[in-house]
Amino acid sequence: MKNMANKIINVLIVDDEKIEREGLKYLLSREEGERNVFEASNGKQALQIIRSEDIQLVLTDIKMPHMDGLELSRRAKEENPALQIIIFSGYSDFTFAQEAIRYGVTEYILKPVNPEDFHKVIQKAEKVIEQRKKKESREIKGKNFL
């Protein structure tokens, strides 16, 4: 049973527009694998969820009230460098993408989201998460052995 729980990925969707969050949840539901999906309508709320839950993947917009997606990414990565963050934005301004890269964001995707592109970036991020979980599991087993 513990092995099954290890395969579940905790995902946080952050967007101030409910319809956008619903759209991303729908696209996620079409992907293979099991996920716990959390939602936040701004970066401030998202940071609280990241701190209280074991979030492994964040899907966030950039422009939101209280704290934008770039500031959220910066703060979240400071607290959890292993966190996978995918930014979905309607802004094609290269400075946003540059800043996202500087903060260690996994991917930067333009809206409207192409389902095929979504599939590719989710698979890539979840593969990194699964590899990290396996590595942590091996390290724990190694410590228990000693």
Give, region by region, the residue ranges found by the protein language model.
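Helix N-cap/capping motif at the beta->alpha junctions
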Residues: 39-48, 69
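Receiver (REC) domain active-site loop signature in two-component systems and cognate sites
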Residues: 64
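Interdomain helical linkers/hinges and coiled-coil/dimerization scaffolds
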Residues: 101, 107, 113-146
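Short amphipathic alpha-helix used as the core "switch/output" element in two-component signaling
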Residues: 48, 70-81
